[in-house]
Amino acid sequence: MREVLLSECIDLLYESHFVISKPFGRSCFDLIAKKGNLRLLIKILKNIDSLSTEQSEELLNISKMLQAVPVIIGTRTRNSVMEEGAVYERYGIKAVTFNTFREQLVGEPPVVYANRGGFFVNIDGKVLRETREKLKISVGELAEVSRVSRKTIYKYEQNEANPSAEVAIKIEEYLDVPLIKGINIMDCIDGLKSQKSRDDAFEKILKEGEDFKIRVIDILGDMGFNLLETTKAPFDAVAEESKGEDAENQNIIFTNIQETENEEIRRKAMIVDEISKILNSHSLLVLEKKTNENKRITSMSISELEKIGDTVDLLDFIEKRKKSTK
């Protein structure tokens, strides 16, 4: 079921003129898609409650670094089938069905979101208050019609609470005015979780016996890169030299770190290189010792990395290596 859903998402994104990465398993996301300035990190799950806390934290952190929107596409929750046209949320990440995602891509956003206690909608509290006052309808009268308290109506008008879909429809019909607002699942999430400290990330990597990765990440950090270490992605770290808030002005290096090179490492590095091209960024494979040169992969030994002065020097090295292999 998951593989079918993944295939359908790939087809849909291509039809919608997105540039997408090849799918890869055992990651906090399955696809990266880009169209114009919109960047999506998509996770496909049959059961959206199977997303772990660790996966969600990493997905949010990578999204923040890449200025991308994380989206989960699934078919059910732990307890029930997901409703079409409704937005669910897991760990701050929006989750929808395939059909709801497709409708969003053609400009028809969902209007209902699932929360504890049922399904709710976002309404325009200002329009609600102005219309009620214009029609000289009291708060008490509207509360009685809607079968909610006066206090609740006040909260709706101040955008401090949202009604259920049923209550919102009653209010719209009584006032004869549209109030329900669509939910754009492609909006960037405000206040994405901050990255964990490097000490926390190092502690986890050390537990896994990854001393070599610690050495490489330390070197990159000393150069002046902002770093995000990962354990649930096809790359081991994201190094950022930011020149501003605009994603197009970022210099990002997706970094794979391995002591020895083998076919599996090369395959992963080529996938990461593809991701870097989609996002107009860079990829780098750092090894203990370089073996045979693979023209499709930009790689260097740790001894070469140690000789690099700063972020500018490393980016220049990568650019020159790219040009020499064309």
Curated annotation (Swiss-Prot):
Gene3D superfamilies: lambda repressor-like DNA-binding domains (1.10.260.40). SMART domains: HTH_XRE. Residues 128-183 form the HTH cro/C1-type domain. It comes from the Archaea. Keywords: DNA-binding, Transcription, Transcription regulation. It holds the Pfam family HTH_3. The keyword Transcription applies. This is Putative HTH-type transcriptional regulatory protein MMP0678.
